[in-house]
Amino acid sequence: VFQKVKQKSIENLGNIPRDAESLAEYAGNAMSKKGGPVASVIRLDDFDTHASQGDGEGKDHGDRLAKVDNVIAAYKRGLGTAWDRSIILTLTEFGRTVAMNGTWGTDHGYGTVGLIAGGSIKKSRVIANWPGLAKNEQYEQRDLMATIDYRSVCAACIEQSLGLDHDLIASQVFFDSKLPRV
């Protein structure tokens, strides 16, 4: 089944460029159409840097964040007026250490951050139970303390965008009936 879906997706894409910005604009356009898809995924690689994250030499983390910004802008262009109903959710597979290592980078860590954007987001804010950055407030005295289960954030986005009940999402999507609300 997966191979059939994959092949159909490839056939539907035609000859559009495969860079993240072009794919985001294409996906936004498809999602803006009546009966179009309700979600898409764009993967951005090269964030797992351990050196030169902010010193302007080599792999610069700022360039990668600009790419995220450009992909969100491409979604917005593609969505057109459907942008007003959109939610864009960024995810990462692992956190980073709080302190910089000896090569101007950070290493794999525990806690992380996410970014939610889109036209349906009406208020800028940070959603966190912020413990602080003092050593005794860090996980194992080196990482951000994870205080919110990111699945709860995903569930809230699904709830808002698809109008589904939180408890249904918790039990049927995340298989955790005790998943807290955010």
Tell me what each language-model feature is:
Residues 1-182:
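Ligand-binding pockets and gating/stacking loops
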